[in-house]
A protein has these predicted regions:
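Short, charged alpha-helical interaction segments and adjacent helix-coil junctions
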Residues: 2-14, 82-87, 174-297
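Conserved single-residue anchors adjacent to enzymatic active/cofactor-binding motifs
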Residues: 1-208, 225
Length: 297
């Protein structure tokens, strides 16, 4: 069986489930009722209505700032903001990402000139396929609490919640257990997961979405290849530089008690190993002309 990175874009599309970022975004934005139900399920809150969800909403505070995209960004009728992120790999910077995302949501929710008291309640939700914190919990729900007295809450209206899908069987409710079973690609038995399965199947019959997915995958492969080539060049240059520095250090240590003949002998050894005359000259202290003479002799 092929590893995920070995699959072609077409094979990835065939195997894609709701846990795939692209499929998740399309299903949620095309079905606001299911997005609303998912939020209520995850957060155990009641939502009267939501605006049409936005897939991969782009945020950029100013020209020089780092631009990012939210997977699914939605607001409800009271102005509360929700960002739902699918995280398929185990990354160590999720807490900082959540902090950054929450700040951007605050900027987005405040119209120009508005008072800070008008900041809306905001939720950053990560659906992680692996344990983001390694403590074996099914859910990590963070709130700002006073260090000296845990009874004192900051009540700044921000919420950061990380779900550990690998612990689907430990989720606090049956509905959550069924949803995260489905997210893991396992058989689930609930009306909600049945609806999700139908929508995922429908999404994968959409030729336009398939084309966008294939294009995105190909672009990502090109970017990864370019970055890999750039990194390989950097590493190669650093390895050459490290070797030269190591050779120079060895020569300088030995050269203190060396006669000129010994230096030339060492230079000949380097030349015999097909090391460039310029590098040999740099390491031995001989002039390039002297090294070339030795090479021709």
């Amino acid at each position: 069986m092929k590893e995920m990175h070995e699959l072609t874009p077409a094979e990835k599309w065939e195997q894609a489930t709701l846990a795939d970022n692209f499929i998740f975004c399309k299903v949620m934005t095309a079905n606001p009722d299911l997005c609303k139900e998912l939020l209520e399920l995850l957060l155990n809150i009641k939502i009267e209505r939501i605006e049409i969800p936005v897939a991969e909403r782009s945020f950029k505070v100013d020209y020089d700032s780092k631009g990012i995209r939210f997977d699914v960004y939605v607001k409800d009728g009271t102005g509360r903001c929700f960002d739902i992120e699918i995280q398929t790999t185990n990354r160590t910077n999720l807490a900082k990402r959540a902090r950054y995302y929450q700040g951007l949501m605050d900027v987005d929710s405040l119209v120009s000139g508005a008072d800070y008291s008008e900041l809306n309640e905001s939720y950053v939700i990560f659906l992680c396929m692996e344990d983001a914190f390694g403590n074996g919990l099914p859910v990590y729900d963070f709130h700002q609490v006073c260090k000296q007295d845990s009874e004192v809450l900051l009540n700044d209206g921000t919420h950061k919640v990380f779900f550990n899908a690998s612990k689907y069987d430990k989720m606090p409710t049956e509905s959550l257990r069924e949803f995260f079973k489905f997210l893991n690609g396992l058989n689930a038995a609930s009306d909600f997961t049945d609806q999700l399965e139908q929508k995922v199947r429908y999404a994968k019959t959409n030729a336009q979405w398939r084309h966008r997915f294939m294009t995105w995958e190909q672009e990502m492969r090109i970017q990864v290849k370019e970055k890999s080539e750039q990194l390989a060049k950097i590493i190669a240059n650093e390895m050459v530089e490290d070797r030269v520095n190591a050779m120079r250090a060895d020569i300088e240590k030995e050269a203190k008690g060396m006669a000129a003949e010994k230096v030339e002998e060492t230079a000949r050894k380097f030349l015999a190993e097909k090391i460039a005359p310029e590098v040999v000259a740099k390491c031995t202290g001989l002039s390039l002309e002297q090294v070339k003479k030795l090479a021709n002799g």
